[in-house]
Amino acid sequence: MRRRKALVREVLPDPIYGNKVITKFINSLMYDGKKSIATKIMYGAINLIDQKGGEKKGIEVFNDAIENVKPVLEVKSRRVGGATYQVPIEVRPARQQALAIRWIIAFARKRSERTMIEKLAYELLDAANSKGSSFKKKEDTYKMAEANKAFAHYRW
């Protein structure tokens, strides 16, 4: 076991919107330390949403997407005797945000649009409108937890 809990590093807000969640999103989007490319993709997607999103601004769509994809419950495996049970547990707020960001990026990368900017923009729009793959992932996670509600007393 570790001696002490790792300190949570403070993330600086992004320079354009002053939003810490956008900084975390950019950091998750980044490959091989290429932050400038990840930043271009993120801001490009927000600008594309501004053009196509209708009455909502890009930053509002982004915030709605993150909120809609945040999971409330998830399941963890727990061995009891010889059996492994999927035990539903509540998700901490920091993990909710991290999972939402991770799922949106993962499903955006799997989309069929041409550029990553388009993929990310359309995934964010879908998530904000409560549809799309990342929102479905949240729903599936919740259904899994509901199905295993009987094992909730194994929580630790």
Swiss-Prot record:
Pfam families from the UniProt entry: Ribosomal_S7 (PF00177)
InterPro entries: Ribosomal_uS7, Ribosomal_uS7_bac/org-type, Ribosomal_uS7_CS, Ribosomal_uS7_dom, Ribosomal_uS7_dom_sf
Entry GO CC: small ribosomal subunit
Single Gene Ontology MF annotation: tRNA binding
Domain of life of the source: Bacteria
One GO BP annotation of this record: translation
Key words of the record: Ribonucleoprotein, Ribosomal protein, RNA-binding, rRNA-binding, tRNA-binding
Keyword Cell inner membrane: no
Subunit structure: Part of the 30S ribosomal subunit. Contacts proteins S9 and S11.
Family: Belongs to the universal ribosomal protein uS7 family.
Function: One of the primary rRNA binding proteins, it binds directly to 16S rRNA where it nucleates assembly of the head domain of the 30S subunit. Is located at the subunit interface close to the decoding center, probably blocks exit of the E-site tRNA.
This protein's name: Small ribosomal subunit protein uS7
Species the sequence originates in: Campylobacter hominis (strain ATCC BAA-381 / DSM 21671 / CCUG 45161 / LMG 19568 / NCTC 13146 / CH001A)
